[in-house]
Amino acid sequence: LKKIKIEEALIKVLSSPNHSNKNWITNQYDQTVMCDTVQKSGSDAAIIRIHNKDKAIAVSVDSSANYCKSHPTSGGKQIVCENWRNLISVGAKPLAITNCLNFGNPENEEVMGEFAECLEGIKEACEFLNYPVVSGNVSFYNGTNKKNIFPTPVIGGVGLINKLSIPIGHIFKKDKSNILLIGKTFGHLEQSCFLKENYSIEDGMPPEINLHNEKNNGESLLKLIDKNLILS
């Protein structure tokens, strides 16, 4: 691979439609109807206050077509865990999910295989995290000029925040605060936005996911947030 300056690489990633600011879309809609919005879109999850209660619900919607195309089973697990993390990151206990399963022509054996494997990954992650699927729908025959779309299951999750004082955002609150990394990093570059945007490389496998670690990390973070030990 050719050498690239980190500043140039970052600009390319942030300039991509997949990673750039989405405010031009969300600002066209009223996000504060009935004055119940605690946290708008743009953070890990949106938060809405429950009427006459010192509680709120958090909502996050997630997908990863690239992961699901490269390894459908792993991709299915990845998007459930991403959704799980996003809710926990704002102080919400994940309760349940719905899904929208978007795929190409099921008469194509490869597409049907992707569908079955994605479902297996979603099922495995949901069962392990005790994160039930309460509803969903399937959309087949998506494509253009006989070219099927990537397998694109979308997960929408809802979590409960027990106190309105709990929700946390993604913006730093105080100078000189400690920054903590929860979990391990493995330097995995395959299927990364860095390779795709800077080198047009979309090969390889998504990073491995350990459901035991996901659950332990998530539950530990929730405890820290409940004890007011996390600022953002």
Predicted regions and their residues:
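Glycine/proline-enriched, intrinsically flexible loops and inter-domain linkers
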Residues: L1-S232
